[in-house]
Amino acid sequence: MEKLNEIVSAVDGFVWGPVMLVLLVGTGIFLTIRTGFLPWRNLGYALKSTLSKEARTKSRGTGDVSPFSALTTALAATIGTGNIVGVATAMVSGGPGALVWMWISAAFGLTSKFSECMLAIKYREVNAKGEMSGGPMYTMKKAFKHKKFGAVLGWLFALFAVIASFGIGNMTQANSISESLSSTFSVPTYVTGIILTVFALLIIVGGIKTISKVSSVVVPLMAIFYVIAGLIVIIVNIQNLPAGVVMIFKMAFSVKAVGGGLCGTITVAMMNAMRFGVARGVFSNEAGMGSAAITAAAATTDNPVRQGYINMTGTFWDTIVVCTITGLCIASSGVLGITENSTKGSYQVSGTAVTVEAVDSDNKTTTTDYTYEFTDDQLILTDTSNSSNTLTLSVLPSDELNKDENTKLASELAVEESQAAIGSLTGTWTDAAGNHYTFAEDGTFACSTVIKGAALTILSFGSALGKVGGWFVTIGIVLFAFSTILGWEYHGEKAFEYLFKSHKYNMIYRIGFSLVVYVGATISLDLVWNFSDIANALMAIPNLICLLALSGEIAKDMKEFQAVIKAEKASK
């Protein structure tokens, strides 16, 4: 199983490597230019349309749900743990500048989201039950001149969408909920699993109309409360905000930037900020993935372009608003780069070899033999049993020593950090991720890891709201993740319907999907995460081919709709 996990992890790293990120953002850039930047120019119109009374009714055109409900159901699937965990992870792995690259990817992602949603409505069908069925798979099947090629692409998209729905849209979300409730409120995972499964069944069995009703209430409310709480954190830490914002932009474009003081000990290059910012941004808003288009196809509308604009705002609300709130909370609270002591133990030196006996937080002891050598400015530790396992460490700046004690995060077992120097193993060192390694003079050893993910966001909210901040983030994760489960169920169901060319099996999918929620809440999911990441990437490839192939049609329809926009503005 471990070998399988390594293989899947390697494949995941490849498919989500630079090529995929360039394709996703590059397609957005190409479409934005091809459409004459109309998505940017008409963003105000799109936001106004989204918040209008007409968007909440089914009075204009045909469809299953209101335009606003179609948007909120799509947002239910995209506003998830990525907005809380993903942003924090990006800012640790890629530095504070990753937030800027999330904004950049979202700016061009607006056009990708518009395009896939507009096409989904234009080429949707009415199934035997009288319900709308649409999405990239229908677009590929009906719009491509080479019908066989389009049919194959559509089938592949639907297959990977079903796989992704059970992975990143279900089990991983349920797992995030159960872990959060377990760590914050000590709720047993099986209890969380049972409750989630029951609620999922009650809502999902009702289909898109029930899901959209719940989403149209829960999604706006949870987003509003999260934004308000985030603004409180930012206001309380307002004195740090200017420096935090400067650091965000400085580290986004520096060839090599080092963050100290406010933003901790994160050391990154511009490419790192770009890589993690774009990747987390895409995971958060799913622009170019094609998933949101499946929900958009259910909207009641008289013009595909009109609904395309409404669904396009999902990327704005998701990344430009919610992710930005999380990022500014982290930047202004001074928690980025803070570490916690996760490993203690001892070490023994023999010539150029050192044996480290480490005890982790679960009291598991690991003994590793290393050889060590010094370069001009680094300490290199190489595992004697696995030469590919190498640690490259640098001297920890003196102003970062014992920073954890100042923030009262260090455990009682912490080893006092001391200044290291090239030529001597003794002292405190740091790796590229900001983790601290301390070899004390008395032979004791400690490793302090950088806090990231949900824990980092909880710390940032706690800086202003205390323990309540942690509760708030946990509740946010629960609501965001559960809404993602609901939204992705509909995505997967419609893809499932496409594969079997019938709606007759939809109820089987709904029940099966709901029961899998329990599995996700109660088991370890490293392998599932990687599998679902791969499925997500493989969904994106046929969708991007579709968007590029139909770019001329997208631009034509969009430009023709300009007359409608002008007429509507003139009449008001």
Residue ranges: model-predicted function:
Residues 57-92, 119-143, 159-162, 263-316:
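Alpha-helical membrane segments and immediately flanking helix-loop junctions
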Residues 1-81, 91-98, 109, 389-395, ...:
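N-terminal alpha-helical transmembrane segments of multi-pass membrane transport
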Residues 3-4, 34-39, 82-87, 165-178, ...:
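Transmembrane helix-loop junctions in multi-pass membrane proteins
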Residues 23-30, 35-47, 157, 174-181, ...:
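Membrane-interface loop-to-helix entry segments
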Residues 116-124, 128, 229-249, 255-265, ...:
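Extracellular/periplasmic helix-exit of transmembrane alpha-helices
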